[in-house]
Amino acid sequence: MILGIGSDLIDIRRVGKVIERHGDRFLDRVFTDAERAKAARRAKSEKMVVATYAKRFAAKEACAKALGTGIRDGVWWRDMGVVNLPGGRPTMALTGGAKARLDAMTPPGYEARIDLSITDDWPLAQAFVVISAVSSAKA
């Protein structure tokens, strides 16, 4: 059963301007160490790095919407991180307030599954998150 859906669309250039203005202060506040490492590995061009951050920013916004909280009520940017499963499929890893909210919205006898789609086509980045509950026996 679907517990929450969220989407976000962001202008990559806007993220680039925030990074130029605030640098590491912004990156440290919003992105996990794993997300920053992923962006560093894409350092072939500045455009790729900024697009990588923009997609992850959109994913966090979409996830916060799917959680039903937005970035408030104890859910913070670094509580949500984009990670890839062994087969490469992206998903969200939640900690802190985001994990607590996910646990609270998941019915007993079920486990939460977070499906994430992220994409970019300059100058836009988009993310779509679906949070579902799957039977613990099937998980």
From Swiss-Prot:
Catalytic activity: apo-[ACP] + CoA = holo-[ACP] + adenosine 3',5'-bisphosphate + H(+)
Broad EC category: transferase
Annotated EC: 2.7.8.7
GO cellular component: cytoplasm
Transferase as UniProt keyword: yes
Keywords attached to this entry: Cytoplasm, Fatty acid biosynthesis, Fatty acid metabolism, Lipid biosynthesis, Lipid metabolism, Magnesium, Metal-binding, Transferase
Entry-linked SUPFAM superfamilies: 4'-phosphopantetheinyl transferase
Record's subcellular location: Cytoplasm
Residues bound to Mg(2+): 8, 61
An example Gene Ontology biological process: fatty acid biosynthetic process
GO MF term set: holo-[acyl-carrier-protein] synthase activity; magnesium ion binding
InterPro entries documented for this protein: 4-PPantetheinyl_Trfase_dom, 4-PPantetheinyl_Trfase_dom_sf, ACPS, Ppantetheine-prot_Trfase_dom
Cofactor: Mg(2+)
Pfam families found in the cross-reference section: ACPS
Function comment: Transfers the 4'-phosphopantetheine moiety from coenzyme A to a Ser of acyl-carrier-protein.
Family stated for the protein in its record: Belongs to the P-Pant transferase superfamily. AcpS family.
Name under which the protein is recorded: Holo-[acyl-carrier-protein] synthase
Gene name, Swiss-Prot/TrEMBL: acpS
